[in-house]
Amino acid sequence: MVEKRIQPLARDAMAYVLAGGRGSRLKELTDRRAKPAVYFGGKARIIDFALSNALNSGIRRIGVATQYKAHSLIRHMQRGWNFFRPERNESFDILPASQRVSETQWYEGTADAVYQNIDIIEDYGVEYMVILAGDHVYKMDYEYMLQQHVDSGADVTIGCLEVPRMEATGFGVMHVNEKDEIFAFIEKPADPPGIPDKPDFALASMGIYVFHTKFLLDALRRDAADPTSSRDFGKDIIPYIVKNGKAVAHRFAKSCVRSDFEHEPYWRDVGTIDAYWQANIDLTAIVPELDIYDKSWPIWTYAEITPPAKFVHDDDDRRGSATSSVVSGDCIISGASLNKSLLFTGVRANSFSKLEGAVILPNVKIGRRAQLKNVVIDHGVVIPEGLVVGEDPDLDAKRFRRTESGICLITQPMIDKLDI
């Protein structure tokens, strides 16, 4: 990695987080909340990763654009991200879609979500803009990307993942030269172009962009005046710059934050039930791919005051126990057994129940003798006594949202419809 400058560029940057997406592939999990507000890792929300990256990178001016079912997200940020102080030249603004440009126009795309708040951005008076997606899980020091942007003289610098070439068909892919200068941006190509130094890999867009502020605002105004534009960074703004300006790729491996226990760059789009379940369950491994215990790069979130977790009963057939599991505060495991499971705060698991491969969101109550395998249980669900999930695929599919790989999403309306 390059050495950091004495005066970090991040101190003259604003992070603008796009957090208005629904995340429809998460199905009922986003019926009541936007995807960035979905719980992750036993304590945090997904958006906390982008926000923590900005804060840990030294960025002290942050704006978050919200739109779809934003109440849960806004409440979380008001509780957990209220420590910025204007007297220290810090600011944290929540920017809901509010028809600032037109009385009939909400945010129409990712670029429009920035354009409609141009006056607020200008008031910040920053030199650089870091545009972030609020729905990915990763650890990254944006200072390195800012440095590359300045050193290369680029109009836009795009954060990119190195992925196996034929796995890149679902991404926007960069066609680059030996200097990582982008000369083509291809959306979801059938035959992705390889990287010059790694022909079996492709550079896929992470949805992270760095601009000089003036250049970005000029580009947004030009795009807003184009009646054919869809007002989207990936579809409109970036292709225009690639064609008419200078775009440079920043490889995630250069700025990925890794502890001594993390060997590979970690980035996940937990946009499906399977991916969400897997990323949470991965945290129960002895040495997980994502180290959320790294104190040098903390994942900031709302620090809810809770009592410690408690395990009770020690009879041969009724023992509160957990193996290879993550159990958060205010959980009571009362004669239940857990294996390879992740529990958020306030979960109650009652006697003789068994959980394996379970991701349990806050304040769930699990009745006696329930047997739950490979499940995601939504916030506040009450699991009835004796419910069995994970043994009969056909029955599970009739009752719950079951994926092809066998993961069951369980919500309270699904439970209310059961005839048991």
From Swiss-Prot:
Transferase found in the keyword field: yes
The EC number(s) this enzyme carries: 2.7.7.27
An individual GO BP term: glycogen biosynthetic process
Pathway: Glycan biosynthesis; glycogen biosynthesis
Subunit structure, as described in the record: Homotetramer.
Stated family: Belongs to the bacterial/plant glucose-1-phosphate adenylyltransferase family.
Record function comment: Involved in the biosynthesis of ADP-glucose, a building block required for the elongation reactions to produce glycogen. Catalyzes the reaction between ATP and alpha-D-glucose 1-phosphate (G1P) to produce pyrophosphate and ADP-Glc.
Name this polypeptide is given: Glucose-1-phosphate adenylyltransferase
Provenance organism: Rhizobium etli (strain ATCC 51251 / DSM 11541 / JCM 21823 / NBRC 15573 / CFN 42)
Gene giving rise to this polypeptide: glgC
